[in-house]
Amino acid sequence: MLVLGLETSCDETGVALYDSRRGLLADALFSQIDLHRIYGGVVPELASRDHVKRMLPLLRQVLDESGCRTGDIDGIAYTAGPGLVGALLVGASCAQALALAWGVPALGVHHMEGHLLAPMLEEQPPQFPFVALLVSGGHTQLVRVDGIGRYQVLGESLDDAAGEAFDKTAKLLGLGYPGGPEIARLAQDGRPGRFVFPRPMTDRPGLEFSFSGLKTFALNTWQHCRASGDDGEQSRRDIALAFQQAVVETLIIKCRRALKQTGLKRLVIAGGVSANQALRSALERMLGELDGQVFYARPRFCTDNGAMIAYAGCQRLLAGQRDGPAIQVHARWPMETLPAL
């Protein structure tokens, strides 16, 4: 089955073609970072308009790169949520229109299921069951995964997601957007030990997360530096390092607990923050100590992309799932409500 995947949940327009026998044939992506950078964050209306502008050129690009024709496509998968409603509607309406014109089925895909399954596109994909750490700008969750659609949320953030905390901390330090890569860049030259941030909710049982306090701690630290006249670039680097260390160590502690609780030794990390090299290195060390395995997608499939949507949609289309005639998207969508395959 050849599936066209469309991703428009936020500020990236992604289009890909995935074949159930041959694998990923082509993928194309347009990032709106430059469009939103001057505003310090995503402007939903601008995001929606740009998705409209980019969709068909990207579709032509993947068809040209793959050598496929529209008549070869057997189904269309698109991100139906969670995400920005206006942006989601662009992808959903495009998918439904093309499906009607081409006489093929369409299916809305859960954005975070796409992220969770992105490592399946690699040469050595994980085997079920495993624990997944989904860590992005909008989500931080630990999930037990026994199969596609067989998800048990073990713990999640009670306030800011990890990626959101990265972006907000970068903004208060006067750094660019998106904040995650900026924090990671500065942290490389930070001095260990100058600042020590708390590891939130690690002093009690459970697998929940809370990152809003870290953002406040960073703000107070930065304000103290400014008040004392020590607000130069080195202080920014030191705060960035202390913040990143706190987030990474918090995630490591919770992942270790989740693996112990489930008795599993396979961990999948997915979502935009999974591209953070400090986090990857720390997880690899931890899984080495536990004689376990860690899996993640290549960096370009950590952030939003059409390939993960095409893959996830292909699995569900092969199982016979189809959309009805109505276009439905979801700003919020609990992953546990998805049907199991």
UniProtKB/Swiss-Prot annotation:
Which Gene Ontology BP annotations are present? tRNA threonylcarbamoyladenosine modification
What function does this protein fulfil?
Required for the formation of a threonylcarbamoyl group on adenosine at position 37 (t(6)A37) in tRNAs that read codons beginning with adenine. Is involved in the transfer of the threonylcarbamoyl moiety of threonylcarbamoyl-AMP (TC-AMP) to the N6 group of A37, together with TsaE and TsaB. TsaD likely plays a direct catalytic role in this reaction.
The scientific name of the source species is Azotobacter vinelandii (strain DJ / ATCC BAA-1303)
Q: What class of enzyme is it?
A: transferase
The record's annotation in Gene3D superfamilies points to: 3.30.420.40
Q: What is its EC number?
A: 2.3.1.234
Classification via InterPro entries? ATPase_NBD, Gcp-like_dom, KAE1/TsaD, TsaD
Which Pfam families did the record assign? TsaD (PF00814)
High-level lineage:
Bacteria, Pseudomonadati, Pseudomonadota, Gammaproteobacteria, Pseudomonadales
Q: Which PANTHER family match?
A: TRNA N6-ADENOSINE THREONYLCARBAMOYLTRANSFERASE (PTHR11735), TRNA N6-ADENOSINE THREONYLCARBAMOYLTRANSFERASE, MITOCHONDRIAL (PTHR11735:SF6)
**Family statement drawn from the similarity comment of this UniProt entry:** Belongs to the KAE1 / TsaD family.
Entry protein name = tRNA N6-adenosine threonylcarbamoyltransferase
- Compartment list: Cytoplasm
Q: Give the UniProt keywords, A-Z.
A: Acyltransferase, Cytoplasm, Iron, Metal-binding, Transferase, tRNA processing
Q: Name one GO cellular component term.
A: cytoplasm
Q: Which reaction does it catalyse?
A: L-threonylcarbamoyladenylate + adenosine(37) in tRNA = N(6)-L-threonylcarbamoyladenosine(37) in tRNA + AMP + H(+)
What are the recorded GO MF terms, alphabetically?
A: iron ion binding; N(6)-L-threonylcarbamoyladenine synthase activity
Fetch the SUPFAM superfamilies from UniProt. Answer: Actin-like ATPase domain
Please share the entry's free-text remark on the cofactor.
Binds 1 Fe(2+) ion per subunit.
Q: Where does Fe cation bind?
A: H111, H115, D304
Q: Which residues bind substrate?
A: L134, V135, S136, G137, G138, D167, G180, N276
UniProt keyword Amino-acid biosynthesis present? no
Obligatory cofactor(s):
Fe(2+)
